[in-house]
Amino acid sequence: MRVSRRFTILAITAMIFLSLIICIYAVAAHTTVNVILQKQERSYGVICDAGSTGTRLFVYNWVSTSDSELIQIEPVIYDNKPVMKKISPGLSTFGTKPDEAAEYLRPLMELAELHIPEEKRPYTPVFIFATAGMRLIPDEQKEAVLTNLRTELPKITSMQVLKEHIRIIEGKWEGIYSWIAVNYALGKFNRTFTPDFPGTSPGQQRSKTVGMIDMGGASAQIAFELPDNDDFNSINVENINLGCREDDSLFRYKLFVTTFLGYGVNEGIRKYEKTLMAKLKDQNGTVIQDDCMPLNLHKTVTMENGDNFVRRGTGNWDTCAAEVKKLLNPETSSEVCKAEVAKCYFGAVPAPNIPLSNVEMYGFSEYWYSTHDVLGLGGQYNAENIAKKSEQYCGQRWSTIQAASKKNLYPRADEERLKTQCFKSAWITSVLHDGFSVDKTHNKFQSVSTIAGQEVQWALGAMIYHMRFFPLRDSTRNLIVKETHSASESLWAPLFFLSAVFCLFVLVCAKEHSLLCFDDKRRASFGLTRRQYSYKMLKEDRTSSSAFLENFA
């Protein structure tokens, strides 16, 4: 009976053991899939906007949740502010000393690493996108700077630095990125919006997007959506897809987008000073009266050829605006625009037949600074108020403006802004009205710095565009996890069945053993002695069975 009891205990133990294994397996499988599906992986990205006057760092992070929605990217926040840092001068100044380019970016890389978990850094892409400043330097200098960054930057940071992520971007892509950023910030890509944009596919419901004008130091960009049925054909028409699936038209957009290289405010000043120099040569003098500076402000200008002259401010803003207009619409224009075959923007750029006065437009960078920092008129655009305030400001003596600045009456403006405000306000308004034909009275234009409390930068749009495939990667991974989990669930029933069969087998063996190993009294009742039984066991060749049972006993 002792052997039988052992077999019974063994069977019960086996059943409990197998049941525990199956339960643990089931719980672990459920826990794994829940952790993967509920706690999505957070990813990071770094982008440097290498502009004409400096380079700015932006650090973003995101959690992709669905391949049917646009990737949700946000700036990394530290101390209630987005992580951002600007260094000067611009990257283009290293054209003559390219070996120092990577070291110049070291402070930005070090700051980014402080806000990215160490284990995430090798998988964090770094984008170095240079804009107008780098476009203007000689080709050999461009290549030397880029080569240094591609070679040396991986030695400075543990983040992911790829050769193709360090480049000079075309001006139109700067415009596309800005367009993406502003519409993303406004929620125009959300599926919850229902109004159809004219010309989109039947039944395709999405919000009407807005246009944008970004006025930088060296260039200006414009971008707005065209209806699908618009037949305007130009190299400035770009089709983009922000979704992670190429066959999904929901996030596909047709844009008019172009850049005006050399028409940023700082390049505008250079153009203006060249015209002043030309006038001065006709007068054989060294000092010229300048309507685009406050009264009695003096500025010495050194031209590229080494010639010097002095600008002396007269503070006549209306005359300044008229002079600036001539810079946008020179007498020499393209034959297409002269023949009026097509509508054209300034710089003889053919334009679609869409009145921008009727398009909701947002102005960035200098459109905000030049209306807000000194004039205090940022926001909804009012041409009359801007002209009036500009005329009042520029008509002041420079000494009066300096005194007001010392009293903190211009808290948002440094001295350089105060000196150039007259020209810049004339430039941005002339570009808007004379360059893009936006009506001065009836328009939907506004200048902005932030949207929904967030500073809008084209860097955000660039990150959204280049990381758009992340949701597809994560959804594919989750699908594999689910399929694996489903397959494992199908094994539970066979495991239970096999465990039951095994336990039953052990019980049967135990029962058989108990019948063979009964006591002497029962054997005697059958007319058997221990000796006879033992002899018969040997005679019937039950040795192997005995050995088998002895192993279990």
Curated annotation (Swiss-Prot):
This is Nucleoside-diphosphatase mig-23. GO terms for cellular component: Golgi apparatus; Golgi membrane; membrane. The keyword Acetylation does not apply. Residues 30-489 are lumenal. It comes from Caenorhabditis briggsae. The active site is at 174 (proton acceptor). It holds the Pfam family GDA1_CD39. One of its GO terms (molecular function) is ribonucleoside triphosphate phosphatase activity. It is found in: Golgi apparatus membrane. Keywords: Developmental protein, Differentiation, Glycoprotein, Golgi apparatus, Gonadal differentiation, Hydrolase, Membrane, Transmembrane, Transmembrane helix. Belongs to the GDA1/CD39 NTPase family. InterPro entries: GDA1_CD39_NTPase (IPR000407). The keyword Transmembrane helix applies. PANTHER family: ADENOSINE/GUANOSINE DIPHOSPHATASE, NUCLEOSIDE-DIPHOSPHATASE MIG-23. It comes from the Eukaryota.
